[in-house]
Amino acid sequence: MAQKWQTISELAAETSRKVTHSPEEWCRFLTTAARFYKAYDFDDQLLIYAQKPNATACADMPTWNNKMRRWVNAGSTAIALIRKGYGGKPYLDYVHDVADTHPVRGGKDPWLWKLTEENREPVMERLRDTFGIDGSGDLGDLLMETAEKLVQESYGEYLPDLLYEREDSFLEELDDFNVEVLFRNTLRASVQYAVLSLSLIHISEP
């Protein structure tokens, strides 16, 4: 078990290095992470991306069996996630993607949000009303502006942590103002990419 945990820990570290050193790899990670923004944190998203980047809905076996009435397919590979137990001791937990399950009697399919022609206009109207966005741009423009507003409102909560942790990184060479500008622009572009990816609007990798 200790050896398995070490392997997964190393996988997480290597994946983190890869996605933060390559714009293309970061975009591919965002495409996966966008599908799990609500249920899993960044560390989990990294490991899901590393082990099954095409996953769409993940849950542990009890959830699939008891709540969804779906059995995990024989021979399928679980996705290992790192958890902390009593006293902070790490251990591995396992989840399975819906593609590796099948329904039994009374089985349910997970609800996966998707943009359709039927809900496109209601989505646009809701975004305009919620975020006070004027104009008659298309959905892509509306999502871009919404993401920019959200980032502008929230990036300041995370900036102090970044400034504190910048030692021994390339950010160390920048003053506070330029770190802030770089962080805000990177965060905005990442959120926009993830939102557009989830909405299946065509986007090009940088």
Predicted regions and their residues:
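N-terminal accessory/interface modules of nucleic-acid-binding and processing proteins
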Residues: M1-S204
